[in-house]
Amino acid sequence: MKLKEKLDVDHLLFLSNGTIALQIAIRALELKGEIITTPFSYVATTSSIVWENCTPIMVDICQDTLNIDPAKIEQAITPRTTAILATHVFGNPCDVEAIDAVAKKHGLKVIYDAAHAFGTTHKGRSLLAYGDIATCSFHATKLFHTIEGGAVVTSDPEILKSMAMKRNFGHTSLTDFGGVGVNGKNSEVHAAMGLTNLKYVEEILEKRKELCDYYKENLTDLPVEFQKIAADTQYNHSYFPVIFESEKVLLAVMEVLNLHNIYPRRYFYPSLSELPYVEGQSSPISEDVSRRIICLPLYHTLSREEIDMICRLIKRSVRY
C-alpha cells in the first residue's frame, strides 16, 4: 500500500522479481504470436517473450534516446502481432504518446518494461502509470530495492485480478482456483527491506542527480555522447551511461578502470538482436550503440573525489 501511494498508481502487485513480472504480464494479457520489442534492453525483456512461447520482433532504437523508435513500429506490425513490449531505457521515458497511438490504431496491447523507471515522472504522472501493464524490478542493483523483487502495475482491475491469481498458484481463494499459476509471490523479509529503503528514496534521487551532473561536468570536453532525456520528464538518474567514439576506445577505458578496481558495466551488450535465439532481425543502431556504451559507477554514497578519479582515468584513456 505504501509503495502504491508513493508511486501514485492505481494497482500494484509485489512479485518475486522483474522477470516474473514480465512473464505474468504477458500471460495476463493472453498474448500470442508476435510481440514487437526493443533490441536495447536487458536480456529478460526478450527471453520472457520467448519463454511465454511468443516471437520477439525487434524494432531498432532512436540514436539519441536509446528507446525503441516509434516511427519504425508500424512497419513491423503483421496479422500475428498482438502487443508492443517497450523498455524505458535507463529510466528514460519512451515516446509513450506515439506508442499508444500506434497500439490503439492496430488494437495492440502495451507492456512497458519499467525496470529502471522507479521515481521517474512524465508529464506529472509516474512513468509506471503508462501502458496496459508496467513491470518493475527491485533487484539490489536498482535505486529502490527489496534485495530481490519486482512488481506489476495496471489501471485495469480485471487485469489486476488475473495477475494476482497467476502469481499465487492460480488461487482465487484458499480452496478455489481460477486457472494455472506460479509462485510469483515475495516474502515479508523483502517487503520489510523495501519499506526501510522507501524512506530514503527522495534523498537518493536528489543525490544521484547531483552525481550525474558532476560526472557530466567532468566529461563534456571529451568526444563522448550522453543519452537524451525525454521532454516534460522528472528523471530518476538511475544510471549514468556514456557512449564512446568506438568500441576500441571503450575497451581501452574499461581496461584502465579495471586496473584500478573500478568496474563499469556494459549495459546493454550485446544487442538483443544478436541473441542466438533471435535470428535475422538486424538492428544496426542498437548493435552499434551496444558496442560503444558503458554505465559508470553510480550510487548515492559515491563521492566527488571518486568521480574525479574515475574521470581522470577516462580522460587519460581517451586522449592517449
Residue positions per predicted region:
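Short beta-strand-to-turn element immediately C-terminal to the catalytic PLP-Schiff-base lysine
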Residues: 128, 136-137, 150-156, 195
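Conserved active-site segment immediately N-terminal to the catalytic lysine
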Residues: 112-146, 161, 173-178
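Structural detector of well-ordered beta-strand residues that form the stable sheet scaffold
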Residues: 13, 36, 57, 110-111, ...
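Phosphate-binding glycine-rich loop
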Residues: 1-34, 48-51, 58-60, 125
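Conserved SAM-binding loop
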Residues: 14, 37, 58, 152, ...
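PLP-dependent aminotransferase-like
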Residues: 27-114, 121
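PLP-dependent aminotransferase class I/II
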Residues: 1-2, 6-10, 71, 75, ...
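Conserved residues at the C-terminal ends of beta-strands
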Residues: 15, 38, 87, 137, ...
